[in-house]
């Protein structure tokens, strides 16, 4: 009979799902409010491209040392610190007074958000038995599309009615609440679960989960945004071609 996951494991998994959702919600806000930021700071496409590429690069690079820390220190504390940091910096993004201030704040947001994946995946490995682990990873990864969906659904309306800075302020609030909850969550013993057998189905799920967190996947979603939100511009471009 499959081993039943304890309530503590389910509770922490829910927190990890929420952290992942906020991770992708917060990072998507600039993509939604791109036009008002462009107008206020007088930016061209080159500056916006540098901003997106720099965030992706720092996010990818910072994950390596943060993964090292997740192997040696309390992962719940690493997640709490990372979530608190990127929530503060998300709120600070709304206080940016120039493009350069916004640029450096967003780079620091990338460092904070890079703490999520290594610590969360390590926790899931110790919280769930092998026959439940792929399902737990699937629930955790559900935060990615739901975070994007939530951001594209409400950030535009908030920016239109209250200005582009307000979504950054509001996005920070739930981060502080969840950070406090994960801070005091019980840390599972490392290596307490037996290794998961490498079946074909589980390898496929792992590959999909890994790709969905990759910069290539996120970049593809952001590149697809203009065709969804501004079809008339693409239509004009197509006619010129």
Where are each of the predicted segments found?
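Extracytoplasmic gate region of multi-pass secondary transporters
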Residues: 30-31, 215-241
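Residue-level signature of mid-helix packing/kink "hotspots" within the transmembrane helices
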Residues: 28, 56-64, 114, 148-149
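Cytoplasmic helix-loop-helix junction between adjacent transmembrane helices
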Residues: 105-145
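Juxtamembrane intracellular "pre-TM" segments in multi-pass secondary transporters
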Residues: 2-5, 190-221
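Conserved MFS/SLC helix-loop-helix module at the cytosolic interface between two early adjacent transmembrane helices
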Residues: 61-100
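Extracytoplasmic
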Residues: 11-45, 234-239
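Helix-loop-helix hairpin linking two adjacent transmembrane segments in secondary transporters
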Residues: 140-186
């Amino acid at each position: 009979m499959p081993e039943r996951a304890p309530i503590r494991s389910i509770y922490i998994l829910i927190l990890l799902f929420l952290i992942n959702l906020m991770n992708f919600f917060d990072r998507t806000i600039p993509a939604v409010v791109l036009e008002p930021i462009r107008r206020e700071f007088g930016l061209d496409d080159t500056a916006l491209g540098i901003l997106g590429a720099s965030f992706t690069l720092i996010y990818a690079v910072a994950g390596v040392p943060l993964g090292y820390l997740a192997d040696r220190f309390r992962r719940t504390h690493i997640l709490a610190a990372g979530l608190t940091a990127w929530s503060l910096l998300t709120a600070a993004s709304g206080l940016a007074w120039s493009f350069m201030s916004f640029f450096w704040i967003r780079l620091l947001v990338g460092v904070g958000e890079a703490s999520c994946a290594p610590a969360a995946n390590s926790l899931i490995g110790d919280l769930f038995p092998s026959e439940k682990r792929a399902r737990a990873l699937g629930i955790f990864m559900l935060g990615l599309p739901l975070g994007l969906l939530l951001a594209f659904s409400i950030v535009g309306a908030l920016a239109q009615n209250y200005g582009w800075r307000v979504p950054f302020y509001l996005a920070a609030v739930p981060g502080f609440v969840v950070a406090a909850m994960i801070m005091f969550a019980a840390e599972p013993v490392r290596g307490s679960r037996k290794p998961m057998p490498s079946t074909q189905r589980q390898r496929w799920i792992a590959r999909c989960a890994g790709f969905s967190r990759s910069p290539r996947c996120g970049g593809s979603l952001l590149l697809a945004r203009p065709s969804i939100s501004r079809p008339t511009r693409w239509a004009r471009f197509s006619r010129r071609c």
